[in-house]
From Swiss-Prot:
Stated role: Involved in the modulation of the specificity of the ClpAP-mediated ATP-dependent protein degradation.
Disordered: annotated span: 1-27
Quaternary structure and partners: Binds to the N-terminal domain of the chaperone ClpA.
Recorded family membership: Belongs to the ClpS family.
Compositionally biased residues, Pro residues: 10-19
Pfam family for this entry, one: ClpS
Protein name as it appears in the record: ATP-dependent Clp protease adapter protein ClpS
Gene Ontology terms describing biological process: protein catabolic process; proteolysis
Domain of life: Bacteria
Disulphide bridges, residue numbers: none
UniProt cross-references to HAMAP family, sorted A to Z: ClpS
Amino acid sequence: MVRMATKPPSMTPTPPTGAPPRDDGGSVVLERRTQRTQPPQMYQVVMLNDDYTPMEFVIVVLQEFFGKDREAATQIMLKIHLDGKGVCGVYSRDVAATKVEQVREAAHKAGHPLQCLSEPVE
């Protein structure tokens, strides 16, 4: 058995629930919402002190791979020497990992046990 509607449907369509309200012209009005994305987690590249790697080699590595001038490289090298470790720079995760690998490879080729790592900035 088929049932028929007793009254004809209204001619003005009603917007579905949750849809933006329509203005007089029948067009849909959308609101632009600005979305904020979180900045990427940053990582610091840390060089560790050892008793065998020459200070001059550490300075050269800081200049070559981290773009430090002679004075800044010397200051970081002294911090590494005196405190046991020092921050070479702060980068995104991929860049920090690349820098760590560059330092390790250069140290290995030169026959030095210099260690370098990256850790999240807190």
